[in-house]
Amino acid sequence: MRLGRDFYNRDTLTVAKELLGKVLVRKINGVTLKGKIVETEAYIGAIDKASHAYGGKRTNRTETLYADPGTVYVYIIYGMYHCLNLISEEKDVAGGVLIRGIEPLEGIEEMSKLRYKKSYEELSSYEKKNFSNGPSKLCMALGIDKGENGINTISSEEIYVEDDSLIKKDFPIVEAKRIGIDYAEEARDFLWRFYIKDNKFVSKK
């Protein structure tokens, strides 16, 4: 069942935790790709110095952070890598959840072509290990870039998240510091990264 607006229109920390175990769906090139979300990070603009919208900052780049809950926010790091976020909280609040890792479930062959430009059976063990265990890696595997910024997952057929009743949900969740935000002063110590314990597609244990 597809997640609706009410799922995202809640406290960002709750959304970040409850996205774990949900299935990210991407339709591209006539193929459906699916991956179980195994790692997330929460960002809350009003109080979070790691957020692009800290202190209510609004720019052309960050405007999507203030969009309706369930909207896709894609930004670029290092001038070339993309990161996928899902907007939480009410419209104009600027909460978001970064998707940091997914476990491939369906369409793995197409994901492999998008990620490495070769079939999955041709991949080395190193390439398989690094298939989608990081925010930019999963964006490559799913063919996500700035063109997807602003998509509403509530109604879109290109990107959305669903709750698969067959997927086990009673997994232990680890709370940890977020990654790559040493500049964020006290916010760098917030335990706002969440991941499924012992899942091999988590970017960093």
Curated annotation (Swiss-Prot):
Enzyme Commission no: 3.2.2.-
Alphabetical UniProt keywords: DNA damage, DNA repair, Hydrolase
GO biological process: base-excision repair
Organism field: Clostridium perfringens (strain ATCC 13124 / DSM 756 / JCM 1290 / NCIMB 6125 / NCTC 8237 / Type A)
Keyword Hydrolase recorded: yes
HAMAP family cross-referenced by the UniProt entry: 3MGH (MF_00527)
UniProt protein name: Putative 3-methyladenine DNA glycosylase
Family annotation (InterPro entries): Formyl_transferase-like_C_sf (IPR011034), MPG (IPR003180), MPG_sf (IPR036995)
Gene3D superfamilies found in the cross-reference section: Methylpurine-DNA glycosylase (MPG)
Example GO molecular function: DNA binding
UniProt entry tagged with the keyword DNA damage: yes
CDD domains: AAG (cd00540)
PANTHER family for the chain: DNA-3-METHYLADENINE GLYCOSYLASE
Pfam families: Pur_DNA_glyco
Family affiliation: Belongs to the DNA glycosylase MPG family.
